[in-house]
């Protein structure tokens, strides 16, 4: 499935750089907090160093992005940070935001017009959520797993 997914992205002008070295995902402080990660997602982030659309407005996060070492302009938790800023110090709202994001791991971000993301919901057996600005936390389930997500992208049910 992963190879078909990557072929599809390449055919649609995505720039993909493979990771030349084996990496221990769980040595990454951010990723280790979500252990165990779904196998298909783990394979994806271990295999690739960067996966970015041709216009550079949409991208999948890879291991270096979660550690802040990739040089990407946006942080992996950018939308959580935006929400926290919007909470403007309101303690209850801030706690709600942090609680919601604690079990969600964003793996895709779009800054093409409306900001949006896809994330793995660790509270729901690794299902995939889709969220948009301005209320990122009002996300909807769009796939049962990362593998299902890739399948839906290939079939056109999910458009990146």
Model segments located where?
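Surface-exposed beta-strand edges and flanking loops
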Residues: 18, 63, 119-122, 130
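A surface-exposed partner-binding patch
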Residues: 1-112
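Short, surface-exposed coil-to-beta transition loops
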Residues: 112-118
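Generic macromolecular interface patches on structured domains
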Residues: 51, 159-160
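Structured loops at beta-to-helix junctions and adjacent beta-edge loops in soluble globular domains
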Residues: 108-110, 121-123, 133
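Glycine-rich, aromatic-bearing surface loops/beta-hairpins
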Residues: 117, 130-159
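Short, solvent-exposed coil/turn segments at beta-strand boundaries
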Residues: 102, 122-127
């Amino acid at each position: 499935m992963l190879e078909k997914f990557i072929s599809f992205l390449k055919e649609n002008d995505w720039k993909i750089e493979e990771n030349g070295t084996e990496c221990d995902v769980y040595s990454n402080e951010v990723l280790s907090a979500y252990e165990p990660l779904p196998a298909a997602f783990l394979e994806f982030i271990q295999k690739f160093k960067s996966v970015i659309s041709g216009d550079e407005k949409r991208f999948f996060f890879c291991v270096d992005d979660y550690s802040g070492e990739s040089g990407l302009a946006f942080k992996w938790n950018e939308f959580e940070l935006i929400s926290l800023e919007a909470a403007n110090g309101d303690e209850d709202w801030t706690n709600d935001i942090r609680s919601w994001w604690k079990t969600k791991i964003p793996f895709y971000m779009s800054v093409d017009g409306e900001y949006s993301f896809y994330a793995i919901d660790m509270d729901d057996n690794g299902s995939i959520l889709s969220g948009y600005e301005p209320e990122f936390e009002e996300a909807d389930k769009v796939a049962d797993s990362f593998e299902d997500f890739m399948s839906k992208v290939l079939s056109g049910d999910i458009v990146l």
